């Protein structure tokens, strides 16, 4: 009788410990998700604000048939400043923030979760993932974020390429597009976006995580210095954006067709139109040199801010 009671007590104690451990683990996971969301939101906001004037200039060239050059790009920046004022260089940045903050928060948080899930699946729990799962985690994170925030990206592109008299604010863009072009217009360009995000996010996260792993292996230091993170992020941005750039041009043409005089069309028809009118290299890689300037800066700031915020929040929690 006593033995039965003792065994029952032991089992009850073990069950209680298991429930308590599960609750602690769940709480830690929730805290990690919130930490990733906050860090990602701040990282995206800082990075995009830093390069907003260059981003707006790139979009204007992407959606027009004007030939791109660095000289013409900076001339456009200068005349925009003269004619519309300094803050006009950030026109559309409020729409960018509305999109980028949730996009970056979701992307970074999803990346951490996909790393955890894939690490568990492939038996690398708590360790650096091997190359293929590392690439897959980045691609899945980017696809998840793009799918959930795409209409905001279209609104940002519309505000960037139109005069301020056309749309007074973000909500005005949504209302006019819905009334004049239909709700489905909010998803024009979605397919090339996802097709571009897969190599972009996959290669960006893969490159950054790989460089950090190599740094750990050869330097003997567990964490890179902030400027080293910036360099790793810059390399990641350069590789990721170069690989996905033609689809970015196609996406912008499809998003802004209703206000630039181009016809709405499929990916292939838009692609053929660009190549026919402007040539393959000149049309599909228009503004790439601008991206080589702004992309590494933005991605470097983004990845570095995320990592440093994660470190800071872990220290505060402990």
Curated annotation (Swiss-Prot):
Transmembrane segments: 33-53, 89-109, 135-155, 186-206, 230-250, 293-313
Gene3D superfamilies: Mitochondrial carrier domain (1.50.40.10)
Per-repeat ranges for Solcar: 31-117, 129-214, 224-312
Catalytic activity: ADP(out) + CoA(in) = ADP(in) + CoA(out); 3'-dephospho-CoA(in) + ADP(out) = 3'-dephospho-CoA(out) + ADP(in); adenosine 3',5'-bisphosphate(in) + ADP(out) = adenosine 3',5'-bisphosphate(out) + ADP(in); AMP(in) + ADP(out) = AMP(out) + ADP(in)
PROSITE patterns referenced in this protein's UniProt entry, alphabetically: SOLCAR
Tissue: Widely expressed. Highly expressed in adipose, followed by hypothalamus and brain coronal sections containing corpus callosum, fornix, thalamus, hypothalamus, optic chiasm, pons, midbrain, and cerebellum.
Keywords: Membrane, Mitochondrion, Mitochondrion inner membrane, Repeat, Transmembrane, Transmembrane helix, Transport
Any single biological process term in GO: AMP transport
Protein's UniProt keywords contain Transcription regulation: no
SUPFAM superfamilies: Mitochondrial carrier
Function: Mitochondrial carrier mediating the transport of coenzyme A (CoA) in mitochondria in exchange for intramitochondrial (deoxy)adenine nucleotides and adenosine 3',5'-diphosphate.
Stated family: Belongs to the mitochondrial carrier (TC 2.A.29) family.
Record protein name field: Mitochondrial coenzyme A transporter SLC25A42
